[in-house]
Curated annotation (Swiss-Prot):
GO terms for biological process: isoleucine biosynthetic process; L-valine biosynthetic process. The lineage of its organism: Bacteria, Bacillati, Actinomycetota, Actinomycetes, Mycobacteriales. Coiled coil: none annotated. This is Acetolactate synthase small subunit. The keyword Zinc-finger does not apply. Dimer of large and small chains. Keywords: Amino-acid biosynthesis, Branched-chain amino acid biosynthesis, Isopeptide bond, Transferase, Ubl conjugation. GO terms for molecular function: acetolactate synthase activity; acetolactate synthase regulator activity.
Amino acid sequence: MSNGTPTHTLSVLVEDKPGVLARVSSLFSRRGFNIQSLAVGATEQKDMSRMTIVVSVEDSPLEQITKQLNKLINVIKIVEQEEDNSVSRELALIKVRADATTRGQIIEAVNLFRAKVVDVSTESLTIEATGTPEKLEALLRVLEPYGIREIAQSGVVSVSRGPRGIGAAK
């Protein structure tokens, strides 16, 4: 939830063509909705891409946006990923200030979150963490007292639980 507004995760299967991302994102911006997270990547189907869009919006406007998305020629299919029926993950790279006295404590915290150290320097550690947005927020809260120098986060990616994929026939 974001400010009491429901958060929705949409998986959108699209043709892998120039301009599709701009057309899809403009549908949200024209209606004044901020996309909280956006991830786009290849799929198991040649010439198709998958967009995972996270947006905070009430159900009724979301239904309108979904109808408009379905009218776009390059949009093949849209699925709302319900929290109970999907697996969602995000990736974060976090650079934390670390010296000889704090390095051990930071590594201990990183291990608790099943994250890993991917770069070490005399003054910092770079950590790779994957998980739900809530897990990553919790890790950031733990690391904050040490001094976070830099964060790079991917968008949320999500797939339905079970054997069927977004491209599966009905």
